């Protein structure tokens, strides 16, 4: 059999090989047994959940210490790493896998969710300060926009200010990751 360890997010397209099964394992013990299929797994260490979304085919998801759960196309399984609870839902699969085509799709997304996805997509650190505790929900699709264009778009719909801090050069001539401060008033 073939086994893939995953921390982060990956989209898999796997041909069926019954004599050589394919498994994806996450650090928290959740495993996905793959038949010929196309699916996405999100397993970031700093998230409190692991998500599997099935686009085509069939997968079996094995949460730690629980029974196997079969996903069919259009289904999502979310495993809560703290409570060990599992939720199976129907989802808009394209919205979940469009990142592989360079698109960011948000449907009723909070600013916190958008910022986390922007950090990962553009490989930056974003410090988000919600000064008044306001909640906003966004619906947007970004295809070719730069990070600054997206932040400008967000700033037009809320009292949001942002600034980019210049990366600092280290002694070994590498640079720190770009940091962005986002303030919501």
Model-derived segments and spans:
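Short, small/hydrophobic-biased targeting/export segments
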Residues: 2-83, 87
